[in-house]
Amino acid sequence: MATETAIFAGGCFWCMVHPFDQQPGILKVVSGYTGGHVANPTYEQVCSHTTGHTEAVEITFDPAVISYAELVEIYWRQTDPTDAMGQFQDRGDSYRPVIFVNSDQQRSIAEASKEKLIASGRFNEPIVTQIEAAKPFYPAEDYHQDFYKKEPWRAELGEVKRKAFIREKWSD
């Protein structure tokens, strides 16, 4: 089976795992860090805002079952694409919304999807989610992996603002 990877940053990585993890064709979702200038950063280093990293998820998927375009659509429905300085209660560069692309094809799909979202008029504010070339992805510490399964009540609490936003903007 041929597999591909997608990397999405949309705030706290804890909140970004579950929406993808539940989809057919998803083989693995890993929480981690990308986009910075320090190799193998720790959570504490990333939180210090000195490494340039963004919390993200790396998704391994079977493109015969789910397409990259479908993943991008799921991504939009999990984030506030108008907030460049974080997502919901999580603030700062390490929580900024970014689609990290692994190929020209992924870039083309992501850019077309972003243009479609802009043209939809769904949001009154500008769409500021960045589309950037993927950089090395470093898996986060084990206690961050599958957090929504390990600590469901904490994960749910962390998603209150996100879920309210999703209901308001994507309830169609």
Curated annotation (Swiss-Prot):
Extent of the signal sequence: none
EC number(s) reported in the record: 1.8.4.11
Pfam families: PMSR
Keywords in alphabetical order: Oxidoreductase
Gene3D superfamilies given in the database record: Peptide methionine sulphoxide reductase MsrA
Membrane-spanning residues: none
GO biological process per UniProt: protein modification process
Record's catalysed reaction(s): L-methionyl-[protein] + [thioredoxin]-disulfide + H2O = L-methionyl-(S)-S-oxide-[protein] + [thioredoxin]-dithiol; [thioredoxin]-disulfide + L-methionine + H2O = L-methionine (S)-S-oxide + [thioredoxin]-dithiol
Active site: 12
Listed GO MF terms: L-methionine:thioredoxin-disulfide S-oxidoreductase activity; peptide-methionine (S)-S-oxide reductase activity
Root EC class: oxidoreductase
Annotated function: Has an important function as a repair enzyme for proteins that have been inactivated by oxidation. Catalyzes the reversible oxidation-reduction of methionine sulfoxide in proteins to methionine.
NCBIfam families in UniProt: msrA
Family: Belongs to the MsrA Met sulfoxide reductase family.
HAMAP family assigned: MsrA (MF_01401)
Protein name: Peptide methionine sulfoxide reductase MsrA
